[in-house]
Amino acid sequence: MLSVQPDTKPKGCAGCNRKIKDRYLLKALDKYWHEDCLKCACCDCRLGEVGSTLYTKANLILCRRDYLRLFGVTGNCAACSKLIPAFEMVMRAKDNVYHLDCFACQLCNQRFCVGDKFFLKNNMILCQTDYEEGLMKEGYAPQVR
Protein backbone atom coordinates (compact mmCIF):
# COMPACT_ATOMS: atom_id res chain seq x y z
CA MET A 1 0.00 0.00 0.00
CA LEU A 2 1.34 3.43 -0.95
CA SER A 3 0.83 6.51 1.16
CA VAL A 4 1.89 10.07 0.43
CA GLN A 5 3.04 11.87 3.55
CA PRO A 6 4.16 15.44 4.17
CA ASP A 7 7.81 15.36 5.18
CA THR A 8 8.42 16.42 8.79
CA LYS A 9 12.13 15.58 9.09
CA PRO A 10 14.51 14.23 6.43
CA LYS A 11 14.37 10.49 5.99
CA GLY A 12 16.55 8.24 3.86
CA CYS A 13 15.16 7.04 0.52
CA ALA A 14 15.08 3.26 0.10
CA GLY A 15 15.71 3.68 -3.63
CA CYS A 16 18.69 6.04 -3.80
CA ASN A 17 19.82 6.19 -0.14
CA ARG A 18 19.80 10.02 -0.20
CA LYS A 19 17.92 12.16 2.31
CA ILE A 20 14.39 13.02 1.25
CA LYS A 21 14.08 16.82 1.34
CA ASP A 22 11.03 17.01 -0.91
CA ARG A 23 7.74 18.31 0.45
CA TYR A 24 6.12 14.89 -0.05
CA LEU A 25 7.47 11.38 0.17
CA LEU A 26 6.06 7.92 -0.37
CA LYS A 27 5.91 5.17 2.22
CA ALA A 28 5.77 1.65 0.85
CA LEU A 29 6.93 -1.69 2.24
CA ASP A 30 7.67 0.09 5.55
CA LYS A 31 10.30 2.24 3.81
CA TYR A 32 10.38 5.83 2.59
CA TRP A 33 10.92 6.81 -1.03
CA HIS A 34 11.32 9.88 -3.23
CA GLU A 35 8.38 10.06 -5.63
CA ASP A 36 10.85 9.56 -8.50
CA CYS A 37 12.56 6.55 -6.90
CA LEU A 38 9.59 4.25 -6.35
CA LYS A 39 9.25 2.73 -9.82
CA CYS A 40 8.11 -0.51 -11.39
CA ALA A 41 11.07 -2.82 -12.00
CA CYS A 42 9.76 -3.70 -15.48
CA CYS A 43 8.24 -0.63 -17.12
CA ASP A 44 9.87 2.07 -14.95
CA CYS A 45 6.54 3.84 -14.32
CA ARG A 46 6.34 5.96 -11.19
CA LEU A 47 4.19 3.89 -8.84
CA GLY A 48 2.89 6.92 -6.95
CA GLU A 49 1.28 8.11 -10.19
CA VAL A 50 -0.44 4.87 -11.25
CA GLY A 51 -2.42 4.17 -8.11
CA SER A 52 -2.18 3.38 -4.44
CA THR A 53 -1.20 -0.27 -4.82
CA LEU A 54 2.05 -1.94 -5.73
CA TYR A 55 2.98 -5.59 -5.99
CA THR A 56 6.09 -7.43 -4.89
CA LYS A 57 7.30 -10.87 -5.87
CA ALA A 58 10.71 -12.41 -6.48
CA ASN A 59 12.33 -9.28 -4.98
CA LEU A 60 10.70 -7.10 -7.64
CA ILE A 61 8.51 -4.06 -7.05
CA LEU A 62 5.89 -3.98 -9.79
CA CYS A 63 2.87 -2.08 -11.06
CA ARG A 64 -0.38 -4.05 -11.36
CA ARG A 65 -0.09 -4.54 -15.11
CA ASP A 66 3.43 -5.98 -14.99
CA TYR A 67 2.68 -8.13 -11.95
CA LEU A 68 -0.26 -9.73 -13.76
CA ARG A 69 1.72 -10.00 -17.00
CA LEU A 70 4.54 -11.85 -15.23
CA PHE A 71 2.67 -13.85 -12.60
CA GLY A 72 -1.02 -13.77 -13.54
CA VAL A 73 -3.07 -16.53 -15.08
CA THR A 74 -4.09 -16.42 -18.72
CA GLY A 75 -7.05 -18.19 -20.27
CA ASN A 76 -9.14 -18.38 -23.41
CA CYS A 77 -12.29 -16.46 -24.28
CA ALA A 78 -15.41 -18.65 -24.32
CA ALA A 79 -16.75 -16.81 -27.39
CA CYS A 80 -13.74 -16.45 -29.73
CA SER A 81 -11.35 -19.00 -28.14
CA LYS A 82 -8.47 -16.50 -28.36
CA LEU A 83 -6.05 -15.96 -25.49
CA ILE A 84 -7.01 -13.46 -22.79
CA PRO A 85 -3.88 -11.89 -21.24
CA ALA A 86 -3.81 -11.98 -17.44
CA PHE A 87 -3.88 -8.16 -17.16
CA GLU A 88 -6.93 -7.66 -19.41
CA MET A 89 -10.36 -6.80 -18.00
CA VAL A 90 -12.92 -9.55 -18.62
CA MET A 91 -16.59 -10.41 -18.24
CA ARG A 92 -17.65 -13.61 -16.53
CA ALA A 93 -20.81 -15.69 -16.82
CA LYS A 94 -20.84 -18.83 -14.69
CA ASP A 95 -17.55 -20.61 -15.45
CA ASN A 96 -17.00 -18.78 -18.74
CA VAL A 97 -14.65 -15.84 -19.24
CA TYR A 98 -14.94 -13.38 -22.14
CA HIS A 99 -13.04 -10.47 -23.67
CA LEU A 100 -15.06 -7.29 -23.08
CA ASP A 101 -15.58 -6.98 -26.85
CA CYS A 102 -16.80 -10.59 -27.10
CA PHE A 103 -19.40 -10.27 -24.36
CA ALA A 104 -22.41 -9.80 -26.64
CA CYS A 105 -25.42 -11.78 -27.81
CA GLN A 106 -24.04 -14.60 -29.91
CA LEU A 107 -27.02 -14.53 -32.27
CA CYS A 108 -27.50 -10.82 -33.03
CA ASN A 109 -24.17 -9.41 -31.70
CA GLN A 110 -25.95 -6.86 -29.48
CA ARG A 111 -23.51 -5.47 -26.89
CA PHE A 112 -24.72 -5.40 -23.31
CA CYS A 113 -24.83 -2.32 -21.12
CA VAL A 114 -24.61 -2.28 -17.34
CA GLY A 115 -27.85 -3.68 -15.95
CA ASP A 116 -28.94 -5.46 -19.15
CA LYS A 117 -30.22 -9.01 -18.70
CA PHE A 118 -28.50 -11.79 -20.55
CA PHE A 119 -29.27 -15.48 -20.73
CA LEU A 120 -27.15 -18.61 -21.13
CA LYS A 121 -28.17 -21.52 -23.33
CA ASN A 122 -25.57 -24.23 -23.94
CA ASN A 123 -22.90 -21.71 -22.93
CA MET A 124 -24.19 -19.22 -25.51
CA ILE A 125 -24.87 -15.67 -24.35
CA LEU A 126 -28.25 -14.43 -25.55
CA CYS A 127 -29.97 -11.05 -25.29
CA GLN A 128 -33.48 -10.93 -23.91
CA THR A 129 -35.09 -10.63 -27.37
CA ASP A 130 -33.30 -13.70 -28.78
CA TYR A 131 -33.93 -15.62 -25.59
CA GLU A 132 -37.67 -14.89 -25.71
CA GLU A 133 -37.89 -15.73 -29.44
CA GLY A 134 -36.11 -19.03 -28.82
CA LEU A 135 -38.32 -19.73 -25.84
CA MET A 136 -41.44 -19.32 -27.97
CA LYS A 137 -40.04 -21.43 -30.84
CA GLU A 138 -38.31 -24.21 -28.92
CA GLY A 139 -39.53 -23.93 -25.37
CA TYR A 140 -36.06 -23.70 -23.82
CA ALA A 141 -35.29 -21.83 -20.61
CA PRO A 142 -31.65 -20.78 -20.12
CA GLN A 143 -30.54 -19.38 -16.78
CA VAL A 144 -30.91 -15.64 -16.18
CA ARG A 145 -27.79 -13.75 -15.06
Swiss-Prot record:
Transmembrane segments: none annotated. The keyword RNA-binding does not apply. InterPro entries: LMO_RBTN_TF (IPR050945), Znf_LIM (IPR001781). Keywords: LIM domain, Metal-binding, Repeat, Transcription, Transcription regulation, Zinc. GO terms for biological process: negative regulation of ERK1 and ERK2 cascade; positive regulation of fat cell differentiation; positive regulation of nuclear receptor-mediated glucocorticoid signaling pathway; positive regulation of peroxisome proliferator activated receptor signaling pathway; positive regulation of transcription by RNA polymerase II. GO terms for molecular function: DNA-binding transcription factor binding; metal ion binding; transcription coactivator activity. Residues 11-73, 75-137 form the LIM zinc-binding domain. GO terms for cellular component: cytoplasm; nucleus. It comes from the Eukaryota. This is LIM domain only protein 3. It comes from Homo sapiens. The lineage of its organism: Eukaryota, Metazoa, Chordata, Craniata, Vertebrata.
